[in-house]
Each structure stands twice: as C-alpha cells, then as structure tokens.
C-alpha cells in the first residue's frame, strides 16, 4: 500500500525514465527543421562532423539528440519511414544499456538504428545480435541502405563464412550476426596460432534482439567447441537394450515409505528431467548388463572402473523416457536432429553432449556418431557480460526483469506503444482430457473460418501441430502447418497468415522476427511472386499490381471479422512464451483476440495443479466436454508458471555461480595466451619458467637451508640427466670444495641450463628458436587446458554430494577448482621447460619442422563441432528445464585491465597475483 502510494506521488522508475526520454524527444524534434533543409550530401557529412566532435572531447550523450535526428531524417529519405516518438524512447533506452520492451509491430528493427548509429561513431564497432542467420541477413540488407547513406559500413557474420569474409564483417562499423556466431568466434579467436587469424576486434557494444530468448531461454546451455573423443559405439548399442528390460515405477518413494503407486526399476522426475534407478532396479540393471556383456559378472555398477558405464546407463534411460521423437527431435535422412524447444526450429549440426545424443541415436537405430571432447566452452551469460555496454530489445521482458537485473545488471524499460492494442485476451478453458480440449479447439477454428477471421493456432510440439492438422483434414478445413519440418516455407506461410479464413498451425517458431499483417504482407507476397521463375516479367507485374489493389479491401474485411485470433493449445512453463504467442495479434492497434485451451493431461497442469483441478471438476460433477473457465483457475495456472520460472531462475543462477569459477580461470588462461601471441620474443618468459622449475627440482634433492648430510646429489644428477637433458657432476665438485651451500648448487644447475639453452639458440638462430618456444608454449597451454576443462566437468558432476557431509558444494567446487588450476599451471611450466631443454637440434630447419608439426596438430582442431551442452547434465544434482542444442561460434579477446603483481589474483583464490596465476608469467 505504501509502495503504491509512493508510485502515485512520484511515479515508478519506468515513468521517471520515460519522462526523461520525452525531454530528449523534444530536442530531437527541434533539430528536424534545420536538418530537413540540408541536401543529401550535407546530411551524410554529419557523420564526419560527429566523429570530430567526439575526438574533441564531447561524449555520446552530448550529441545523442542531434544524431538521433540525423538518423530519423535519413530514414525518411532512404527508407520512407519516420521514427515514431516511441521508437526514439526505445532507442534512448538501448543507448543507455537497458532493455527496451516494445510490443509486436512497434518497429524494433528500425528503433535499433538510432543507438547503433550513435555508438558506431566511436569506431569501436557495434554488434547487432539476432536469433538466426535469416534475420541477421534480412536486417543487415534492409538497414544497410540507411547506414551506407550516412557513411557507415555494415557487415554480416553468418555461419559457414570463410575466415577472410568474417574478418571483413567484424572490421565494419556495424556487424549483424547470431548469438551463436558471436560466441563461437570468441572461443575460436582464443584457439588461433597467430594474431592474423583472429576475426573479432573487441566487445564494445551489443544490442541483442529477442533478448529474452538469448539471455534467458538459452542461458543454461553452454557453447562448446569439441573434437573427436574415444569411440564407444558398441557400448551404446548394447546398453540401448537395457531400458526394455526395466519397468517404470509410478510415484516417488517418500521418507515414510509411501508415495509409490506401482513399484518398478526406475522412476522419472519430470520436474527435474532426471531418471533414477530404484534399489531393485540397481540389481536388475547389473544382471541385464552382465547378460549384455557390458559388465563383468560379480562387478558392481558403482565400482570406480564402471563410472563410465553408469553414465551410459542413465543416458540411455533419459533417451528412452524424457526425449521424444517429433517433440524434442526429429529423424531425417538417418540423422537425429534436435528441435529447439523455444523456437521450434531444427538445429542442424547441433548435438546434445555427455553421450545423450549417441543414446538417442542408438534408440532410433541410426548411425551413431563419435563422442566429443570439449576444446573450449563458455555460457551466453559470461560471454555477453564481457561487452563494455549491453542492451536488448524484446516484446516480452517485464516478467523476467528481476533476472535481467540480477544476472546482467540490465534494467528493463517498458516503452508505451505507438497505438494502444485492442486485443481481447479471453479466459483459459480447461478440460478433463486432451480429446475434449481438441474438440473445443476445432470448434473455435470452425467458427472463425465461417466468419472469415484468420486464426493462428500455437502448439508446443511438432506432434501436436500435426495432430491438429489431421483433425482439420477430417473437417475439410484448409490450413497451413508451420513447424520444424516445414521451416523452409516459413516466410511464405507467415506472409499469408493474416488473410481472411486463413488457418495457420505453428509451433513456437512462428513467434519471433516476422509480423503477421492483417490482409497479408504485400511486400513479402510481392517478393515471393518476383522470385517465381515460372512467371514472365509481365505476369509478375500484373500479379503484384492486382495484389496491391486488393489489399485494402481484404485488410478492412479482416478488421471487420475481429482481426487475428490466437488459439493456444497448451500453456508453456514460462508466461513469457505464452505472451509471445498472444503478441502475434493486435499489432499497432489492430483488433484481435486470444484464448488458451488446456487439458488436465498437460505437463504443466499434471505436475503442478492437475490433482487439485481434477478434484474440483469431480466435486462440481462437470459433464464431459464442459470446461472450467474462471479467473481464479487462470491465476492458479499463472502461479504455477511463476513457480517454474522461479525454479528455472535459481538453476540459471546456480549455473552462473559455478561457471564464474571456470570463467575466471578461462579469462586468465586466455590472457596468458594472448601475451604469448602478442610477444615478438618470449625468451625472458622461458628463462623465468626454467628458473622456477629447476629450483623446484633441486629443492627435492637439496632442500633449502639444509645440511650436507641431507643432500641426495646422486639422485639430483640422475634426474637432471634423464628428465631434463643436463649432464652435471655435483658430488665430486662438492667433495673437492672447501664449503658449498644449497644455493650454490642451485646456481650451478641454473648456469648449466642457461649455457645449454644459449647453445641451442646459437645453433638454430634466435628467430627460429623463438618461433619454436612460442609453438611449445601454445601447444602445452591448449592441450592441458582441454584436460583441465574435462577435470572441471567431472568435479562439477559430483560436487553436490559434498552437501551430505555438511559442506557447501559451491565453496568446495571453488576451492578444488583453484587447486586444479594451480596444478595446471605447474604442469604447463614443467612441460614447456622440459620440451625446450631436451630438444635435440641439428639445424634450424629441423626446429622449424618441429614448430610446424605442433601447429599442424593444433590446426587439426579446426575440424570441430559446435554445440550446446545438455543443461540437465551441467550441474549435477540440480533440477531444471530441458535445454536445447544450438549453433554458435567465437569472438575477439578481451584482455581486460592489467593486473598488478601485488593485486588480488583474478581467479578468486585470495592470493596475490604474483604468487598465484602470475607465477607463470
């Protein structure tokens, strides 16, 4: 009550921001008359003028109003479109590094041109991030006319582009691309062997379109570059037979022994998307595995040597119980292709990790591809947090505003629409069974068809969309289906979806990127006609002219019928996804309507509210086919959705807390790698490493400040000769000297090592040897970093068990990960020094061949796969929504601020940098 009163008196934070923006809009409008009087050349030269003003000390905020006015005027001349005041407000929010929530049809693509142009004036580059290649290319081509008019270069970063083209795209003032490409480019840039191989040039400013989809929905699925690992094809085939021998338990056993409706060998936790063996299931699984030849008789499934086998068992169970064909994946041309849960699109070339994809391939009887080893990985959360300034646009962000602020420090600003929406959102209708629900859906579609109203039916899976299509076929109602199997016709189907009597069935993929225009999208339909090679030029012109003449009457007809009607056949776990479906209707003040038809069989209701609602229906003695339609029921469903959203937020936050540990180590490792790449000669670094390593070796046999009786000189001589390539006589020298202390022995060893090193340099030449040293260090760093990533992954999978010992798993993970990183640095130091000291050199050409060989080995990593990990395997013991596989690529390196020797180490150990990660340098 008090908060509400304060908001009434002083306005909400959103209201105050909009008030500030309106003041800037007045300034933008004030520039308009003078800019209108300029010719095209004079208007375009404003770009050079702005750059000079920035160089003279003015800030972007100082020139923002005039720059926005220039873009608005240029848009009028080039695009024949003038930015609305709402778009100016959205542009200001984006420039300030906030999320602008703007409804469907409000022109987010045009809005972005304002802050993109302004921030591109700095010359540091602006990244415009979209969800797929089609939108990236479309928006770049569409808006490049405006940017080119103003003297800005535009690049497009698409998958499968060659190296030179990518470099050119990143060198442009403005670069459009997908979140996947930007992320994978970052990782690839940190795997290069030469500075010239990098493509990115910095992470200054990014605007993320459909920011909720990228930073929320895909946040839990790390980007992974992986290479071939050990082949376990036969094992997958054997274990695929196991689930058919096991019975599913119905109900979870509680602490008091109740809860099990039907005993079985395993039970499925649908909330956490995990499968667990029961006590009887363990015994039965072991017996079956022995019969299958996968387990030795008498061995336990939990024996240390069978950890990998256990991993395969659970992967097979999850593949058979949780991952469904035509819902989570499709099988095409003998391949298992993942369906993106959030967009409904096929994820060509993307694979689930941790053996899950191979388990699904075994289940479907298709060829099993080899497993992969992680070479580099990062989450979207940590990638996008590296940008100097980050902003985003979407039509549905307010429900996730807390998470955006908590994780990314991004404030959400709700921009008022240019025209108030007239869409009517009707109460949900809930039925006892799916059959009754679909009967009601078909009846609603028939009613709309009879009055000429276009309908968009939203489904959550390919299977459901095809079921509705079959029901409509029986009623002889014409319709279009848009799902991952028909994605190639997406543009054509969406262009027609707003025409009278059109029935469009779509999975979530129809929800983003393209507006449904009432009466049909004339521009899109015209381009489709123009692309039809079967028509002559005269026929094309005639059809396009006819289309334009008919459009207004068709548009008016659709308006009179009530606009686009949205039918949702199921509630999604997230309210935001439901709002996206609703948002397809009522664009720019158009009329429209929406309604969700639900069933007690739906996963959301079954898991969170099914029993309670079923009891209500039975008490009310509701007849078959009669729905519940009440505000209190709709609110209870939204309450269940909020619970799921809260749980998923906790999981994403937990993932981030774990990944932050690896992220600190990743940044430090990449920083070290960059120093090596950027240094013309790392001789001083090698000398420091050599001294550190040999001092440590000597201290084992000749402890510091020890007595002569404690020395093992013979052992030191042997180890230096056998492992470090140094032949030295210490025992006779010590016996013949009057007095020798431990420091003199160390100095003698170091001096001999330096002489040996100098001799190799003299023989090969400084330039050749410097190249060899760089290759050795990069090879060791990259190979051991890959092993370290695997070690961190294994550590994370089991760390939750520390909770049973009353220890904080996250703190334990941080501590042990730091210890592993310390071991990594020591191994790298020893590896590098040993390689350089033991190399036998006969000529400079031999040394060059050795360098090329190591570089070739690393270059083989270019034959890699890009994937998202399955998030349910990312944090063992966690619960969460199912993740999707996704396509991605890498960006440039951010070296970050230089760390002083006495500053706290950025890896989080609490030690000084010089005593921790800085020890390597």
Curated annotation (Swiss-Prot):
Its EC number is 7.4.2.8. It is found in: Cell inner membrane; Cytoplasm. Gene3D superfamilies: Helical scaffold and wing domains of SecA (1.10.3060.10), P-loop containing nucleotide triphosphate hydrolases (3.40.50.300), SecA, preprotein cross-linking domain (3.90.1440.10). GO terms for cellular component: cell envelope Sec protein transport complex; cytosol; plasma membrane. SUPFAM superfamilies: Helical scaffold and wing domains of SecA (SSF81886), P-loop containing nucleoside triphosphate hydrolases (SSF52540), Pre-protein crosslinking domain of SecA (SSF81767). It is an enzyme of class 7 (translocase). Residues 575-594 are annotated as: Disordered. Zn(2+) binds at residues 905, 907, 916-917. GO terms for biological process: intracellular protein transmembrane transport; protein import; protein targeting; protein transport by the Sec complex. InterPro entries: Helicase_ATP-bd, Helicase_C-like, P-loop_NTPase, SEC_C_motif, SecA, SecA_CS, SecA_DEAD, SecA_motor_DEAD. May bind 1 zinc ion per subunit. Monomer and homodimer. Part of the essential Sec protein translocation apparatus which comprises SecA, SecYEG and auxiliary proteins SecDF-YajC and YidC. Part of the Sec protein translocase complex. Interacts with the SecYEG preprotein conducting channel. Has a central role in coupling the hydrolysis of ATP to the transfer of proteins into and across the cell membrane, serving both as a receptor for the preprotein-SecB complex and as an ATP-driven molecular motor driving the stepwise translocation of polypeptide chains across the membrane. This is Protein translocase subunit SecA. It comes from Polynucleobacter necessarius subsp. necessarius (strain STIR1).
């Amino acid at each position: 009550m008090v908060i509400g009163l304060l908001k009434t008196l002083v306005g909400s934070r959103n209201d105050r921001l909009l008030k500030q923006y309106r003041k800037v809009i007045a300034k933008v409008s004030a520039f308009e008359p003078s800019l209108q009087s300029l010719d095209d050349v004079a208007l375009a030269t404003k770009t050079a003028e702005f750059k000079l003003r920035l160089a003279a000390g003015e800030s972007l905020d100082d020139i923002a109003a005039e720059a926005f006015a220039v873009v608005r005027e240029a848009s009028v001349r080039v695009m024949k479109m003038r930015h609305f005041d709402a778009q100016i407000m959205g542009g200001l929010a984006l420039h300030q590094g906030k999320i602008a929530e703007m409804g469907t049809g409000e022109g987010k693509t045009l809005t972005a041109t304002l802050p993109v142009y302004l921030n591109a004036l700095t010359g540091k580059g602006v990244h415009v991030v979209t969800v797929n290649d089609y939108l990236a290319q479309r928006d770049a081509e569409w808006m490049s006319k405006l940017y080119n008019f103003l003297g800005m270069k535009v690049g497009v970063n698409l998958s499968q582009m060659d190296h030179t083209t990518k470099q050119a795209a990143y060198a442009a003032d403005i670069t459009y691309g997908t979140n996947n490409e930007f992320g994978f480019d970052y990782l690839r840039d940190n795997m290069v062997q030469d500075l010239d191989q990098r493509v990115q040039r910095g992470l200054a400013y990014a605007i993320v379109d459909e920011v909720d989809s990228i930073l929320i929905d895909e946040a839990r699925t790390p980007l992974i570059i992986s290479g071939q690992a050990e082949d376990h094809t036969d094992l997958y085939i054997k274990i695929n037979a196991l689930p058919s021998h096991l019975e599913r338990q119905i109900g979870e056993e509680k602490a008091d022994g109740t809860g099990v409706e039907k005993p079985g060998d395993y039970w499925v936790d649908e909330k956490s998307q995990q499968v667990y063996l029961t006590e009887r299931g363990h015994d039965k699984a072991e017996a079956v595995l022995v019969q299958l030849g996968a387990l030795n008789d008498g061995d336990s499934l939990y024996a240390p040597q069978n950890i990998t086998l256990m991993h395969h068992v659970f992967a097979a169970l999850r593949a058979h119980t949780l991952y469904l064909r035509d819902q989570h994946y499709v099988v095409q041309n003998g391949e298992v292709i993942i369906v993106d849960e959030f967009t409904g699109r096929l994820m060509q070339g993307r694979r689930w990790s941790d053996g899950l994809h191979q388990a699904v391939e075994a289940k479907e009887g298709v060829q099993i591809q080899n497993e992969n080893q992680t070479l580099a990985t990062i989450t979207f959360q940590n990638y996008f947090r590296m940008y100097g300034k980050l902003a985003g646009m979407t039509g549905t962000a307010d429900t996730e505003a807390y998470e955006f602020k908590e994780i990314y420090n991004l404030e959400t600003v709700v921009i008022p629409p240019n025209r108030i929406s007239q869409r009517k959102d009707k109460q949900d209708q809930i039925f006892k069974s799916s059959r009754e629900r679909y009967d009601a859906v078909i009846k609603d579609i028939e009613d709309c068809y009879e009055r000429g109203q276009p309908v968009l039916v939203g489904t959550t899976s390919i299977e459901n969309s095809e079921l509705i299509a079959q029901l409509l076929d029986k009623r002889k109602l014409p319709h279009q289906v848009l799902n991952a199997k028909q994605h190639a016709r997406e543009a054509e189907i969406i262009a027609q979806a707003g025409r009278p009597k059109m029935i469009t069935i779509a999975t979530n993929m129809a929800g983003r990127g393209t507006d449904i225009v009432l009466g049909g999208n004339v521009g899109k339909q015209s381009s489709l006609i123009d692309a039809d090679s079967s028509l002559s030029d005269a026929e094309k012109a005639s059809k396009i002219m006819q289309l334009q003449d008919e459009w207004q009457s068709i548009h008016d007809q659709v308006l009179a019928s009530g606009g686009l009607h949205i039918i949702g056949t199921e509630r999604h776990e997230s309210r935001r996804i439901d709002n996206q479906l609703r948002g397809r209707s009522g664009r720019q003040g158009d009329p429209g309507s929406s309604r969700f038809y639900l069933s007690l069989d739906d996963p959301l209701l079954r898991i969170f509210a099914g029993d309670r609602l079923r009891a209500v229906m039975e008490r009310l003695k509701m007849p078959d086919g009669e729905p519940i339609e009440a505000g209190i029921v709709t609110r209870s469903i939204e309450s269940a959705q909020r619970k799921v959203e809260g749980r998923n937020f906790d999981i994403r936050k937990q993932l981030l807390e774990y990944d932050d540990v690896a992220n600190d180590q990743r940044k430090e490792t990449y920083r070290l790698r960059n120093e090596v790449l950027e240094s013309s000669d790392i001789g001083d670094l090698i000398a420091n490493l050599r001294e550190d390593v040999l001092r440590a070796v000597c201290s084992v046999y000749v402890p510091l400040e020890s007595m002569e009786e404690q020395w093992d000189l013979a052992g030191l001589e042997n180890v230096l000769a056998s492992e470090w390539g140094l032949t030295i006589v210490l025992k006779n020298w010590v016996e013949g000297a009057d007095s020798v202390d431990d420091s003199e022995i160390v100095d003698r060893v170091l001096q001999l090592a330096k002489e040996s090193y100098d001799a190799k340099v003299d023989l090969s030449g400084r330039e050749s040897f410097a190249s060899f040293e760089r290759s050795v260090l990069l090879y060791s760093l990259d190979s051991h970093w890959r092993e370290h990533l695997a070690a961190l992954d294994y550590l994370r999978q089991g760390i939750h068990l520390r909770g049973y010992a009353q220890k904080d798993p996250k703190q334990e993970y941080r501590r042990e990960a730091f210890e592993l990183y310390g071991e990594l640095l020591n191994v790298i130091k020893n590896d590098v020094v040993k390689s350089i000291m033991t190399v036998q050199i006969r000529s400079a050409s031999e040394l060059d061949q050795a360098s090329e060989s190591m570089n070739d080995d690393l270059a083989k990593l270019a034959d890699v796969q890009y994937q998202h990990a399955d998030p349910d395997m990312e944090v063992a013991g966690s619960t969460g929504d199912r993740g999707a596989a996704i396509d991605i690529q890498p960006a440039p390196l951010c070296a970050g601020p230089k760390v002083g020797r006495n500053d706290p180490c950025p890896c989080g150990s609490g030690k000084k940098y010089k005593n921790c990660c800085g020890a390597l340098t």
